[in-house]
Amino acid sequence: MLFCPIVEARVVCTSALRLHGAEGAIPLSAKNLGELMLKPIRWNTFIRDFFVIQIGFLLYGLAIALIVRANLGTGTWLVLEVALANLLEIKIGTMTVYMGFMVLILALILREQVGWGTLANILSIGPWLNLFLDFISTSKENPALQIGMFLLGVLIQGMATAIYIGVDAGAGPRDSLMLAVHRTTGVSIRVARGAIEVIVVLIGWLLGGPAGIGTVAFALLIGPSVQWAFKLFKVHLHKPELAEAAAD
């Protein structure tokens, strides 16, 4: 059987799969495949980690709600999610949950490792988003307020990202897909992320999603916001590819 140490699962198992395909000498069991794809849970810190990660997801939902209500344009994935939510006549947060599961399935098909935090990400951010959208009003006629809400949303999203990634319980579904594309195609993180987001925002825009100047501003500002938050909370990334993704 193929044994894959979890810490280096992505590198070791990918290499072993190539050897299996070339030489037919290394069988891969369903159990080991599960170990490859599922990040182990640290039970001794699980309660603390769960509490901290939920704070991150609460802030993430607040950040997205502020950006949506600023009415200047949203982040790339939200352009598509808002468009689909309008077409299906469901809440944006609910569509965020559905989209998270669809993206997760793609990442799993590409054999990307996920953790309990990945599932918590999908199930938690959407409900928080729906809650905050019910309480925050749309701003359309006060440019100063719109810009302020947008910038505050970007700042809070950077903090939320640093908090939940700092727990190290698994990347979100969209980051998992990005890493899977990077690993399976050999393209850089920047190219993988850029290609995915261009496709997503184009489809969302064609479906009537809220692409605008805020979409461009978000793309330019979210990287510095996340980097600042990483330094603020002293978050250290153990995987080089995640460090590069956070910097983008």
Predicted ranges, named:
Residues 32-248:
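Core subunits and conserved enzymes of cellular information-processing
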